[in-house]
Amino acid sequence: MKEFKRYLELDRSQQHDFVYPLLFQEYIYVLAHDHGLNRSILLENADYDNKFSLLIVKRLITQMDQQNHLIFSPNDSNQNPFLGHNTNLYSQMILEGFAVVVEIPFSLRLISSLEGKETVKSHKLRSIHSIFPFLEDKFSRLNYVLDILIPHSIHLEILVQTLRYWVKDASSLHLLRFFLHEYRNWNTRITPKKSSFSFSKRNQRFFLFLYNFHVCESESIFVFLRNQSSHLRSISSGTFLERIYFYGKIEHFVKVFTKDFQDILWLFKDPFMHYVRYQGNSILASKGTSLLMNKWKYYLVNFWQCYFYMWCQPGRIQINQLSNHSLDFLGYLSSVRLNPSMVRSQMLENSFLIGNAIKKFDTIVPIIPLIGSLYKAKFCNVLGHPVSKPVWADLSDSDIIDRFGRIYRNLSHYHSGSLKKTSLYRIKYILRLSCARTLARKHKSTVRAFLKRLGSELLEEFFTEEEQVFYLTFQKTYSTSQGLSRGRIWYLDIICINDLANHE
């Protein structure tokens, strides 16, 4: 990043943040190929890894440098005058390099906007669990929530036009259009599915950048409203940069609706409005009434359709009351429930019992999705009965036990924020018995014999760090489940959710 910053600071008045020349630098492709920059992408192209070399990079740069213009033929996808015979390999390398280059202006502006602020120093904000303490603190005071499926069916050409207001380099935008029109097998619209995106595996970084940019644009109305309201102040809003074009659209949007709905513009200054985005969904929670939430729903649908040309069906935004609705949120079922309590009040010789209900944010671990994940990974059948893992039978006994134990510790680590650990005990039972069945299958023995042989050794592998400390300290007095079933812990080192289906 220092090299990028040094380049962009060279004669900035003439460069105007031009990033296109960086495509002719070898280190860009090395960085793009570095797995350290692609840690979040689970699916990688092994065939591309085998073909990558600096010699091919130099050959590609030489070939690009000799071309005066880009020419593409939609009728002949195998050979392109610009890319040559190695269309697939070269195009993939250019596209991955382009994905790195186009992120540079955003990264530099983000760093400059956060200079001197505490937000940039707090790496713990990256943790998925960091959102749950916020929900615990805020949601217990709120009444309604908008459960929003972020509109995603947007034409890629609209993304290119929107990107113009961030990237001033016309050459880079022309190259982006070139790629989008070159490959007819790419979808012309970004269409994320329920839990994953239908992006090409070899070009995930590029399309993830486009999708994240699209989401940032579609939700930037909330940043504008928070900045315009004197009641709402947010440190995180400093990470979004002012854009004259966008704010011009917002001002026009407000003027249009002011003419007809002056009496309800106060909803923009709701001091109890909170917004959270996760994966392809978002949550907008408020202390207001259902009428207020219906107005928000109406404004969001019209804003996305009129100013981002995205068709958003009203059914994609659900209005729910927090007191009787559970949110399926990042592997937890989160809800706000009433916790009744009785208070005795005594005046002289008379005493009274006063009932008091306190709202409390509650999180539980849904057992059915977890069993479904274990079933996909072939640790159990569809009913949750443990089965052996034949593909691991060739490993050593210690490796088999370590793999099963590590999976449970990861699951327990992630779901440590639940007060009720019953679901985790069920998962531990499935994984322990699946481990025993795998070992018995390997040695052609019975499960009973292996459980009798391993005993405490197998048990210790399925202890988390907290359980190990508790077990060693209070081994003779209390059971582990009694001491740990009442605690809630949020870890600030979790940056991703492990998918058991991909754990082979």
From Swiss-Prot:
Single GO biological process annotation from the record: RNA splicing
Taxonomy, superkingdom: Eukaryota
Compartments where found: Plastid, Chloroplast
Keywords: Chloroplast, mRNA processing, Plastid, RNA-binding, tRNA processing
GO molecular function, one term: RNA binding
Pfam families named among the record's database cross-references: Intron_maturas2, MatK_N
One GO location term (cellular component): chloroplast
Chief localization: plastid
Record InterPro entries: Domain_X (IPR024937), Maturase_MatK (IPR002866), Maturase_MatK_N (IPR024942)
Family: Belongs to the intron maturase 2 family. MatK subfamily.
Job of this protein: Usually encoded in the trnK tRNA gene intron. Probably assists in splicing its own and other chloroplast group II introns.
Protein name: Maturase K
Natural source organism: Actinidia chinensis (Kiwi)
Gene that this polypeptide is encoded by: matK
